[in-house]
Amino acid sequence: MTGITLVQGDITRQSADAIVNAANSSLLGGGGVDGAIHRRGGPAILAECRRLRAGHLGKGLPTGRAVATTAGDLDARWVIHTVGPVWSATEDRSGLLASCYRESLRTADELGARTVAFPAISTGVYRWPMDDAARIAVETVATTKTSVTEIRFVLFDARAYEAFAARLG
Protein backbone atom coordinates (compact mmCIF):
# COMPACT_ATOMS: atom_id res chain seq x y z
CA MET A 1 0.00 0.00 0.00
CA THR A 2 1.17 3.49 -0.81
CA GLY A 3 1.38 5.99 2.03
CA ILE A 4 0.86 9.69 1.38
CA THR A 5 2.58 12.18 3.68
CA LEU A 6 2.92 15.96 3.78
CA VAL A 7 5.98 18.01 4.67
CA GLN A 8 6.31 21.78 4.74
CA GLY A 9 9.76 22.73 3.55
CA ASP A 10 12.35 22.75 0.79
CA ILE A 11 12.09 19.81 -1.61
CA THR A 12 15.81 20.08 -2.41
CA ARG A 13 16.54 19.10 1.23
CA GLN A 14 14.48 15.90 1.06
CA SER A 15 15.88 12.39 1.10
CA ALA A 16 13.96 10.15 -1.33
CA ASP A 17 14.60 7.70 -4.14
CA ALA A 18 13.18 10.25 -6.58
CA ILE A 19 12.45 13.97 -6.36
CA VAL A 20 9.94 15.33 -8.85
CA ASN A 21 10.84 18.59 -10.57
CA ALA A 22 8.12 20.90 -11.86
CA ALA A 23 10.16 21.66 -14.97
CA ASN A 24 9.58 23.75 -18.04
CA SER A 25 9.57 22.03 -21.42
CA SER A 26 13.15 23.08 -22.22
CA LEU A 27 14.47 21.00 -19.27
CA LEU A 28 17.23 23.58 -18.94
CA GLY A 29 16.28 24.99 -15.55
CA GLY A 30 14.17 28.00 -14.71
CA GLY A 31 12.61 29.68 -11.72
CA GLY A 32 10.93 28.34 -8.62
CA VAL A 33 11.41 24.70 -7.71
CA ASP A 34 12.96 23.99 -11.13
CA GLY A 35 15.77 26.48 -10.56
CA ALA A 36 16.26 25.33 -6.96
CA ILE A 37 16.61 21.68 -8.00
CA HIS A 38 19.11 22.55 -10.73
CA ARG A 39 21.13 24.80 -8.38
CA ARG A 40 21.30 22.35 -5.49
CA GLY A 41 21.63 19.26 -7.69
CA GLY A 42 24.57 20.73 -9.56
CA PRO A 43 25.73 20.54 -13.18
CA ALA A 44 25.15 16.79 -13.64
CA ILE A 45 21.38 17.31 -13.86
CA LEU A 46 21.68 20.01 -16.52
CA ALA A 47 24.22 17.95 -18.47
CA GLU A 48 21.82 14.99 -18.58
CA CYS A 49 18.91 17.26 -19.54
CA ARG A 50 20.99 18.64 -22.40
CA ARG A 51 21.69 15.09 -23.60
CA LEU A 52 17.96 14.36 -23.58
CA ARG A 53 17.30 17.53 -25.58
CA ALA A 54 20.02 16.55 -28.08
CA GLY A 55 18.36 13.14 -28.44
CA HIS A 56 14.70 12.14 -28.52
CA LEU A 57 13.43 15.29 -26.76
CA GLY A 58 14.71 17.76 -29.33
CA LYS A 59 11.51 19.81 -29.15
CA GLY A 60 11.38 19.65 -25.36
CA LEU A 61 9.33 17.61 -22.91
CA PRO A 62 5.60 17.84 -23.64
CA THR A 63 3.19 19.03 -20.94
CA GLY A 64 1.95 16.16 -18.79
CA ARG A 65 4.89 13.89 -19.58
CA ALA A 66 7.80 12.89 -17.34
CA VAL A 67 11.44 11.89 -17.78
CA ALA A 68 14.16 10.97 -15.29
CA THR A 69 17.75 12.11 -14.88
CA THR A 70 20.42 11.72 -12.25
CA ALA A 71 19.82 13.62 -9.02
CA GLY A 72 23.36 15.00 -8.98
CA ASP A 73 24.18 16.33 -5.51
CA LEU A 74 20.63 15.93 -4.15
CA ASP A 75 19.93 13.24 -1.53
CA ALA A 76 18.09 11.12 -4.10
CA ARG A 77 18.89 8.68 -6.87
CA TRP A 78 16.85 10.41 -9.57
CA VAL A 79 15.07 13.61 -10.48
CA ILE A 80 11.84 13.03 -12.37
CA HIS A 81 11.13 16.10 -14.50
CA THR A 82 7.51 16.78 -15.45
CA VAL A 83 6.00 19.76 -17.23
CA GLY A 84 2.82 21.07 -15.64
CA PRO A 85 0.19 23.04 -17.52
CA VAL A 86 -0.24 26.78 -17.22
CA TRP A 87 -3.55 27.61 -15.49
CA SER A 88 -6.31 28.81 -17.79
CA ALA A 89 -9.69 30.20 -16.74
CA THR A 90 -11.11 29.41 -20.20
CA GLU A 91 -9.76 25.91 -20.87
CA ASP A 92 -9.87 22.85 -18.60
CA ARG A 93 -6.30 21.59 -18.37
CA SER A 94 -6.82 19.49 -15.23
CA GLY A 95 -6.22 16.28 -17.19
CA LEU A 96 -2.73 17.50 -18.04
CA LEU A 97 -1.99 18.29 -14.40
CA ALA A 98 -3.21 14.84 -13.34
CA SER A 99 -1.03 13.34 -16.07
CA CYS A 100 2.06 14.93 -14.48
CA TYR A 101 1.47 12.93 -11.31
CA ARG A 102 0.54 9.68 -13.13
CA GLU A 103 3.48 9.87 -15.52
CA SER A 104 5.89 10.70 -12.69
CA LEU A 105 4.70 7.63 -10.77
CA ARG A 106 4.96 5.50 -13.93
CA THR A 107 8.54 6.71 -14.38
CA ALA A 108 9.28 6.01 -10.70
CA ASP A 109 7.94 2.47 -11.14
CA GLU A 110 10.17 1.93 -14.19
CA LEU A 111 13.18 3.06 -12.13
CA GLY A 112 12.27 0.94 -9.11
CA ALA A 113 11.87 4.00 -6.87
CA ARG A 114 9.96 3.37 -3.65
CA THR A 115 9.90 6.89 -2.17
CA VAL A 116 8.94 9.90 -4.27
CA ALA A 117 8.84 13.57 -3.22
CA PHE A 118 6.47 15.82 -5.18
CA PRO A 119 6.14 19.61 -5.20
CA ALA A 120 2.76 21.25 -5.83
CA ILE A 121 3.06 21.16 -9.63
CA SER A 122 1.90 24.24 -11.61
CA THR A 123 1.11 26.35 -8.51
CA GLY A 124 4.01 28.79 -8.88
CA VAL A 125 4.55 30.85 -12.02
CA TYR A 126 1.95 28.70 -13.84
CA ARG A 127 -0.65 30.13 -11.39
CA TRP A 128 -2.79 27.02 -10.83
CA PRO A 129 -5.12 27.73 -7.85
CA MET A 130 -3.69 25.91 -4.82
CA ASP A 131 -6.93 24.30 -3.60
CA ASP A 132 -7.69 22.84 -7.03
CA ALA A 133 -4.08 21.75 -7.57
CA ALA A 134 -4.16 19.96 -4.20
CA ARG A 135 -7.42 18.21 -5.11
CA ILE A 136 -6.04 16.99 -8.44
CA ALA A 137 -2.71 15.91 -6.93
CA VAL A 138 -4.15 13.98 -4.00
CA GLU A 139 -6.95 12.33 -6.02
CA THR A 140 -4.53 11.33 -8.77
CA VAL A 141 -1.84 9.76 -6.61
CA ALA A 142 -4.45 8.03 -4.43
CA THR A 143 -6.02 6.35 -7.48
CA THR A 144 -2.89 5.56 -9.51
CA LYS A 145 -1.64 1.98 -9.34
CA THR A 146 2.04 2.12 -8.35
CA SER A 147 4.78 0.17 -6.61
CA VAL A 148 5.91 3.36 -4.84
CA THR A 149 5.47 2.87 -1.09
CA GLU A 150 5.72 6.51 0.03
CA ILE A 151 4.48 9.58 -1.78
CA ARG A 152 5.59 12.73 -0.02
CA PHE A 153 4.15 16.11 -0.97
CA VAL A 154 6.73 18.74 -0.04
CA LEU A 155 4.92 22.05 0.24
CA PHE A 156 6.84 25.30 0.27
CA ASP A 157 4.61 27.31 2.61
CA ALA A 158 1.79 27.01 5.14
CA ARG A 159 -0.91 27.90 2.59
CA ALA A 160 0.09 25.02 0.32
CA TYR A 161 0.45 22.64 3.26
CA GLU A 162 -3.03 23.52 4.53
CA ALA A 163 -4.59 23.06 1.08
CA PHE A 164 -3.07 19.58 0.73
CA ALA A 165 -3.91 18.66 4.34
CA ALA A 166 -7.55 19.58 3.72
CA ARG A 167 -7.62 17.19 0.73
CA LEU A 168 -6.04 14.33 2.65
CA GLY A 169 -8.65 14.73 5.39
Swiss-Prot record:
| InterPro entries named among the record's database cross-references | Macro_dom (IPR002589), Macro_dom-like (IPR043472)
Gene3D superfamilies, per database record: Leucine Aminopeptidase, subunit E, domain 1
Domain named Macro is located at: 1-169
Tree of life domain: Bacteria
Q: Which family does it belong to?
A: Belongs to the MacroD-type family.
NCBIfam families from the UniProt entry: PRK00431.1-6
For this entry, the protein name equals Macro domain-containing protein SCO6450
Q: Give the species this sequence originates from.
A: Streptomyces coelicolor (strain ATCC BAA-471 / A3(2) / M145)
